[in-house]
């Protein structure tokens, strides 16, 4: 490393330096697990909420639109607010969206919640990955960084469906929303310790 060991100044001194980037990578995976509506439980959602398949897919498209529309603002937010503020607001947004999404039956409101969840999801992921970019590649080599980023994103998509299916098999499809809300509480706990 060019200037000594990699350190993230937003962590307190008791957190070991070697653990700091791994914690941020873990938080990025947690943000990518979130979705508001989980397609692994598509058929159960259709049956229990009396919705059509296209309605649920529109929720996913709203989530993607939230990420795409908010993306140009990410750098402005990064330079305007602190790391703690951005991660805390993103985690709170994902937490609230996951808690209320299973109970909404009015479709435009559900689409809006999924849209907001997508904005929070991209904010949290971007904040984590941009902070550990120099740990992954000290020379800012994007041929190293983007494969890592794609592993996090695509791996989390697969893992999200696996977890959703497992929780749905043993419990109920809404337990994935509760699971992600619990993970967001862990993110908030990390931010405040």
What are these regions (language model features)?
Residues 32, 36, 118-126, 158:
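Small-residue-rich segments within alpha-helical transmembrane domains of MFS-like 12-TM solute carriers
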Residues 20-53, 71-74:
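Extracytoplasmic
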Residues 91, 97-98, 113-114, 187-188:
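A generic transmembrane-helix signature of 12-TM secondary carrier transporters
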Residues 115-151:
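Cytoplasmic helix-loop-helix junction between adjacent transmembrane helices
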Residues 103-113:
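Helix-loop junctions at membrane interfaces in 12-TM secondary transporters
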Residues 63-65, 154-155:
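Short hydrophobic/small-residue motifs within alpha-helical transmembrane segments
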Residues 148-192:
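Helix-loop-helix hairpin linking two adjacent transmembrane segments in secondary transporters
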Residues 69-105:
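Conserved MFS/SLC helix-loop-helix module at the cytosolic interface between two early adjacent transmembrane helices
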């Amino acid at each position: 490393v060019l200037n000594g060991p990699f350190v993230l100044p937003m962590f307190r001194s008791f957190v070991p330096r070697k653990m700091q980037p791994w914690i941020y990578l873990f938080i990025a995976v947690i943000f990518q697990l979130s979705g508001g509506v989980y397609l692994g439980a598509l058929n159960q959602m259709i049956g229990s909420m009396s919705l059509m398949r296209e309605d649920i897919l529109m929720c996913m498209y709203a989530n993607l639109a939230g990420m795409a529309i908010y993306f140009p603002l990410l750098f402005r937010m990064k330079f305007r607010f602190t790391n703690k503020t951005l991660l805390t607001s993103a985690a709170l947004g994902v937490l609230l969206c996951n808690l209320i999404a299973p109970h909404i039956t009015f479709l435009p409101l559900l689409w809006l919640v999924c849209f907001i969840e997508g904005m929070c999801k991209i904010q949290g992921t971007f904040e984590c990955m941009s902070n550990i970019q120099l740990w992954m590649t000290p020379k800012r080599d994007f041929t190293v960084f983007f494969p890592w980023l794609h592993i996090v994103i695509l791996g989390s998509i697969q893992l999200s469906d696996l977890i959703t299916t497992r929780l749905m098999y043993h419990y109920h499809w809404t337990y994935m929303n509760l699971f992600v809300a619990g993970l967001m509480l862990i993110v908030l706990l990390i931010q405040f310790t």
